[in-house]
Amino acid sequence: MGNCLSASTLPTEPNAPKSVEEGVKVFTVADLKKATNDFGNQMELGESLGYINPKTLSPAKKGVGMAVAVKKIYLANEQAFQDWLVDVEFLRHNSHPSLVKLIGYCYDRDMLFIVSEYFPNGSLGSYISRDSRPKSLPWETRLKISIGAAQCLAFLHSRKQAGLYRRYLTASKILLDSDFNARVSYFGKPKVSLDELVYTIGFSNVAPRYQYPPPEYILSGMSNMAGDVYSFGVILLKMLTGLGKDLTISAKREIKNKKYNIVEMIDPDLKNSYPLEAGRLMCELIKQCLEVDPKMRPTMQEVLDNLNAIAQI
């Protein structure tokens, strides 16, 4: 692989961050190879563990440097990189405690290497399905994760003029630190068309299916902030039931039609460790998020307010 584009040879982008002084570091391939032991510290598909000096952001050794995640992403074209830089510029000026921090990047031909914070507990997606998760999270932790993610989404929606909503929102986009605080990753923005969801930034050239599509997307190919609320509702439903990929259509129908039984719907691993009223209100909130009519769904701020109220029970 060749050298990454330097700050002086980046594709034309007037406000693109070009240095560590501006908050986002432009790395070279050599830097990243050194930081990750030649990309040998694999964590998951396309992602390696690396170490850098927290002050200079130069490569460092394990035990000395700060742990970072280095993600390799294939780009459809240079325009995809230009689009990504627009998001980077916005996020440099609109940080949020529940939003994953971008440390730097490297752009080389059709590949983008993203250097971001390292999250030792991985993603929420690993903890949802009770058949495959490493451990069951207690009610309080699940609620804390939900609130953290909702805080970030409400923040992004409040900055809607920047076009940062309509994320490809899944449980794997919600990352967990050592204390299980949630941070939402914005990496991998999709381009939505009428016929399919096509990644402008993705792990392969195969277009993935929209995992949590709101009804309006299925009907028209269009979605907006209300679509985010629907997708978040699906995530809450999976967290509540522990069913993960095995979430049944009947379970969704039950909770939509208010024909749910709290004891039967909520993850049995939680047993009697949650307040029944909190469980009932969570079910009601999920039902509202999954409304077929997008106008009937709450805003993300209203979702956040409801989650905070549930946490007080």
Swiss-Prot record:
This is Serine/threonine-protein kinase SZE1. The keyword Protease does not apply. Expressed in roots, seedlings, rosette leaves, floral organs, siliques and inflorescence stems. Gene3D superfamilies: Phosphorylase Kinase, domain 1, Transferase(Phosphotransferase) domain 1. A lipid is attached at G2 (N-myristoyl glycine). The gene is SZE1. ATP binds at L49, G50, Y51, I52, N53, P54, K55, T56, L57, K71. Disruption phenotype: Partial suppression of the pleiotropic phenotypes conferred by the dominant mutation zed1-D (e.g. high-temperature-dependent growth retardation and autoimmunity). One of its GO terms (biological process) is positive regulation of defense response to bacterium.
